[in-house]
Amino acid sequence: MKDSTRAKSSKQEKRIAKAIGGRQVVGSGSTPFLKGDVIAGDLFIEAKTKMNPSQSITVKKSWIDKAKEQSLAMRKSDYAIAVSFGDPKDYYLIEDSFMEELLKAREAVKQVQE
């Protein structure tokens, strides 16, 4: 039997939470207070997955706007949209400023390691 949309989404959320050391937000979106699908420290993640394996996914600006708004409401400083093409691999959409911070942090870690 095929997974329901909720079951497929939950699998993705659990996978993301495990990979980044976060937690799945159970019942996300069902209350005015619980938003986002995964929270890891100050990072708010909204997960989007395809039901069946696909070569493409449509990204909507409204997803990004909503994630940004909800992350601020939950007092999270950063947000990302995690997308899956229906397989067990996730890709992340982030703002340019967050990408710049990540690259600077990565370079700083490399400097310390050398």
Where are these regions (language model features)?
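Catalytic phosphate/metal-binding cores of nucleic-acid and nucleotide-processing enzymes, i.e., regions
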Residues: 1-114
